[in-house]
Amino acid sequence: MNKRIAIAGVLAAGYLACAQAMAQWELDSEHSSINFISVKNAAIAETHSFDSLVGYVGKSGNVQLTIDLASVETLIPIRNERMRDMLFKTVEFPSASIAAEVDPAILAEVDKGGTVSTEVPVRLSLHGVDDDLTVPVTVFSDGGSLSVVSSRPVIINAADFGLAGGVEALRKVAGLNSISTAVPVTLNLHFSHAP
């Protein structure tokens, strides 16, 4: 099983490398973030993130992002471990991906220094499930970089991706009354011109 996962990882990395060769913009992972909020006991909200993201925007407007789920960061090491093992099950599902198509006219407008607010249909692949979402974003550029920022959070329902059982396992092990399965997610993505 681990061999299959390793082979899949190598193939995915090879595909991403080939695709990035045709990229117009490459993700600046150091200055980008995908954040999500967990709400426990119906009153306590905490923000978490992922430390490892890769991605690109292609010349035709095709967008691909890959999230290393093992890089989840909650600022509490034992909680990081529990999310990796009990929620995301990263041995079996090491990454999530986001694919989208952006109208090239939007990229052209932004490349000239404009700012565009729009809604982008995306395909989220998470925990073996693919689902279509609409993400409201603001896109802008300072000439040397492209920024894509959530206009408002997108609500991800854990049950839609087969994660409700993992949320329940986390609730039990932490001794909580509840953890919401409706999870607000925000994007703050910055891309640099591909060489």
Can you say where each PLM-predicted feature lies in the sequence?
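Bacterial N-terminal signal peptides that target proteins for export
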Residues: 1-8
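N-terminal signal peptide c-region/cleavage motif recognized by signal peptidases
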Residues: 16-18
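Low-complexity, acidic/polar, glycine-enriched regions of mature
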Residues: 21-195
